Structure formats: structure tokens, C-alpha cells
Amino acid sequence: MTDTARRYVALHPGDPAPWFVQRTTSSPRFGFDLAAGRYVVLCFFGSAADPAAQAALGAIARSRAEFDDERACFFGITLDPADESSGRLRDTLPGIRFFCDFDASIARLYGAAPSDVRPGEKQVPLRRFWLVLDPGLRVMRAFAFAGAGGGHNAVLDYLRALPPPDLVQGFAVPPPVLFLPNVFEAEFCRDLIAAYEADGGTESGFMVEADGKTLMQLDPRQKRRRDFSLQDPQLVSGVQARIERRIAPELRKVHQFTPTRIERCIVSCYAAADGGHFSAHRDNRSKGTAHRQFAVSINLNDDFDGGGLGFPEYGGQTFKMPVGCAAVFSCSLLHRVTPVTRGRRYAFLPFLYDDAAARLRLSNNRFLGDDVPVYQDPILEDAS
């Protein structure tokens, strides 16, 4: 079967680049969606043993300074297991990584390998090319390998000519976030902080997907925070009433969305003494969190430095909301909390979702690991 008879995915400028999870030479599980927030250069070269691939990788090596994980990063995609076993390819951080795509799953997604590749098929016809993605992981331009130079210099010249990532549209674009002042009164914020202080909270983890299960993971390199779950019925009902009265109407107006459920009533603390922070992440990327629709972040105090809320897909700006002000945003947005450098940042951090998402959450109980509490919904369970 010839190359032209095979079916290949075709990506064009403006198309969203497919997300995937794959191993790199230094990471057993790398979620590509977390690369957003900078220009991304992808190179589908097949095997580093190939002279054309060597020329491409040589061009990257000569331009090492371009890839700092701030303005830009590079991902090479190899289909050759010998590239890893021989040590020909190694991640060099910051900025340069290699995906071990030995099952051609990435190559199929991006059109480097035919989408109809059969398991165990030998001599897969490979299309070698470069892709440059914008900070939102949309395709900007593709470059084919061509001749001895392989078009490699053209890719790098194009990258160097791009504006700063914050100005890729020609102007700064604010993140799609609702900022709602006075959701919590100052006195109510103090009551929530007092409830946290009386308990002290526990170390907070985050959800990961492994072997089809959603698991809780603790990793202070990714997240350092302590959480306290509210137990006082008066405080819980006070939170619920204020969200229903002051956040839900704005969600209906702006997003035509009506929340009917709140996940977790927690007061959280990012402390400078602990190196409090949360690296870039999305809140709904596992089966156990897929129901989450909107995240809410309400600052309960302002006597701290650092701890800004940022959205890397929309630039490097971070936000420090006034006391009682809510930031409300889609759980699909990449976001982070910068390190707190002085004092403590206290925040109330629930997730909102609707009836359909509640049914999804209930059905996904079977995907929860043993360390994740099973979801119960009396309303849905009674209805069934």
C-alpha cells in the first residue's frame, strides 16, 4: 500500500493541537496539555539515526537558548526505541524533551503516521515535519523537511520573529474569568479563617489518572497547601447561600449555566513558610474529576505577598483578588498559584457543577482509587 493510499490526519493553522499523555525520556507520564503558555515546537523526525533527523536535532542544539520553557519549548517525537536505549536522545531541561512514541499514537494524532496503522505493522510510511503551536496549543504553521537543510532554519527563523507569548494576538488577551467583588463579607472571611486556624488543616494533594483509576497524589514540587473541610453547619449554609445569591446569577448571565452542586467546602492555606504554591494544572483531567465545570477562588485575606492566580494560556499576568472577591473560571483552563513569599494566603476553593455532571460523577465512582472517597448523591440515588 502506498503512502498516498493511506489516511493521514491533516492539521491546519488555527486548529487545536490534540492533547495526549505519553512518556518522555525523563518522565513516565507527561500530559501535553500542560505545555500551554509558551510557543511549542514539535518535530516529527522518526528516528535520530536518520541523517535528516540528525540535521534537525543539530539545528535545535545550535539554538538551545531559544528553548527555556518561558518563551518556547521543544518536543521531538521519536518512533525508534533505539533512540532511548542507546542514549541518543535525552530530555535536557528546561525546554527540550523527547516523546517516546513507540506505538505511534502521537504520530497518528498529528498526521505523521497513517491513522489506520495496524498493530504490529512494519514499515509504516512516516511523514516528517515541524509544527509550531501558539501558547493556547493551536497550530500556527507547519514546516516540511526539505533537502539537506530540512527547512530547519526556516522553523527557527519563524520562531525568533514571533512576538512575546503574551502578545501572540497582537494585543494582550485577558483570561475568560469572572471577577465578582463582595461575594463574602470581610467578617464572614474572618470566620472562615478562624475555623481553619482552630483545626490547622491537612496536607493537600491532587488527583492523577493511573491505569484507568483516579488516585490522590502528594507531591510538594507540584503543590504545597493545607486544607480544612468546613464542618460547622452554619458556615456551610452561609457559603452555599452566598454562592447561590452572588455567583450563580452571573454564571447564568455570562455562560448560560446553572450550578446545582458544590464540591468540597474547604478553606485552604498557602503559607510562605511551607513554600505554598500550586503548579500549572487543570481541574477536570481525570475520570474522577471530569464532572467539575467551574472553579471558584475567593481570597479571605490580603496580608500576604505572592500567591497570585495565573492563567498561562492567556499570558503571564497573575491576579490577587481583594478580600471576598471571587474568581470564577472553567475547570478546563490551565491555571496556577505562584509561590507565597510572605505571610499566608487563605482562600475558599469550591467547584460547581450541574445535575448532568452529578450523574457523570456518580457513574464514575467505579474509576476511583481506594484512597478517593466514593461520591454519594441522595437526590439522584433516590430518583433511580
Regions found by a protein language model. Give the residues of each.
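Short coil/loop residues immediately preceding or within conserved phosphate-binding loops
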Residues: 17, 127-128, 262, 295, ...
